[in-house]
């Protein structure tokens, strides 16, 4: 039973903020159902991008990210979210059940972390090297608290090998019609509440200066941040010790935590998952980190120009499409 009564409006507001979480091609593969002052998170299987994400692994990462974002939003509202993961063995889509207890105190850190949800962007442009990296790296390592997830940093002298892994992914998919059709659909020019708008994509010239990004359709002829030259970001790798669904969900939660920590430190980020979508390129990344773990997601972390406008926020689905209240059964 929940220890405190939280109104549906508070839960709904927290879910709306949480839905700023990143997901593959902004597919937002989640559903929330509130009932009796609790809320449940479900995977929306109709929003899994199977041509890209064959096993639904990345959908689980996205759901983990939205779950952590929700906990952050509730903490800023003065409430601790108590999460039970995979509570129903008969329903694999039921990822978490959450009840609530009052927090002792809402700190400035809680508020700033919730603010970081709105400030965070997926920035696909080149970055400058992040300052004070040793301190930042130490902080990011402490952020990854799940026993099933580890964090590593790609050494600078191994960046060519990482670029080769990225190139291998794209070459293996050169004739994959289903993959490219899915990619083009989710980067369409039409105004919508999902997918990646053209304003969030990069030109060919900009893409050439980030040697391990996903190859998206080229929609512009711009060359932003020419003063940065080639990307000098640091690259993090989040890995799991197995491929169990629980580990993937936790990895998504840790991805959220890393992104928010980096944002709070004033740094720009870009999540990369294409390099882990195929076994051949994923194995190359595993060799680079030299650990008995399976890479699930990479994150570029760096510095964007201080006076530059941040990339526009990508759209999100209306809250009433992802959040529902289950009526009480009075029988």
From Swiss-Prot:
> In the UniProt record, does the keyword NADP occur?
yes
Report what the protein is called: Putative NAD(P)H nitroreductase acg
According to its UniProt entry, this protein's organism is Mycobacterium tuberculosis (strain ATCC 25618 / H37Rv)
InterPro entries in the record: Nitroreductase-like, Nitroreductase/BluB
Gene Ontology CC annotation, any one: cytosol
Q: Which classification does the entry list for the species?
A: Bacteria, Bacillati, Actinomycetota, Actinomycetes, Mycobacteriales
Where is FMN annotated to bind?
28-32, 316
Q: Keywords, A to Z?
A: Flavoprotein, FMN, NAD, NADP, Oxidoreductase
Q: What induces it?
A: A member of the dormancy regulon. Induced in response to reduced oxygen tension (hypoxia), low levels of nitric oxide (NO) and carbon monoxide (CO). It is hoped that this regulon will give insight into the latent, or dormant phase of infection. Induced in C57BL/6 mouse lungs 3 weeks after low dose aerosol infection with H37Rv bacteria.
Q: Which cofactor does it need?
A: FMN
GO MF: oxidoreductase activity
Q: Could you list the residue ranges that cross the membrane?
A: none
Q: What is its EC number?
A: 1.-.-.-
Family affiliation: Belongs to the nitroreductase family.
């Amino acid at each position: 039973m929940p220890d405190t009564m939280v109104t549906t409006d508070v839960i709904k507001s927290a879910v709306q903020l949480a839905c700023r979480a990143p997901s593959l091609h902004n597919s937002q593969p989640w559903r929330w159902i509130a009932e009796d002052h609790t809320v449940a998170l479900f995977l929306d299987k109709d929003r899994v991008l199977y041509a890209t994400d064959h096993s639904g692994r990345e959908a689980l990462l996205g759901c983990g990210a939205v779950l952590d974002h929700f906990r952050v939003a509730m903490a800023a509202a003065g409430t601790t979210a108590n999460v039970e993961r995979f509570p129903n063995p008969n329903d694999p889509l039921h990822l978490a059940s959450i009840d609530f207890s009052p927090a002792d105190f809402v700190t400035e850190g809680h508020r700033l972390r919730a603010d970081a949800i709105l400030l965070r962007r997926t920035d696909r442009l080149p970055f400058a090297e992040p300052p004070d990296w040793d301190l930042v790296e130490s902080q990011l390592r402490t952020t990854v608290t799940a026993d099933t997830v580890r964090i590593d940093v790609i050494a600078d002298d191994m960046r060519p090998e990482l670029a080769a892994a990225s190139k291998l992914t794209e070459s293996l998919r050169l004739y994959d019609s289903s993959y490219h059709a899915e990619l083009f659909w989710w980067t369409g020019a039409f105004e919508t509440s999902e997918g990646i708008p053209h304003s969030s994509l990069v030109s060919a010239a900009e893409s050439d200066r980030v040697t391990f990004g996903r190859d998206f359709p080229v929609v512009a002829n711009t060359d932003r941040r020419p003063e940065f030259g080639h990307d000098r970001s640091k690259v993090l790798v989040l890995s799991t010790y197995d491929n169990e669904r629980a580990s993937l969900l936790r990895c998504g939660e840790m991805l959220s935590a890393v992104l928010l920590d980096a944002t709070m430190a004033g740094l720009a980020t870009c999540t990369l998952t294409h390099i882990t979508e195929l076994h051949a390129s994923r194995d190359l990344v595993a060799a680079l980190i030299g650990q008995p773990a399976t890479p699930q997601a990479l994150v570029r972390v760096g510095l964007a120009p201080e006076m530059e406008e941040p990339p526009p926020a990508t759209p999100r689905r209306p809250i009433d499409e992802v959040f529902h209240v289950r009526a009480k059964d009075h029988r």
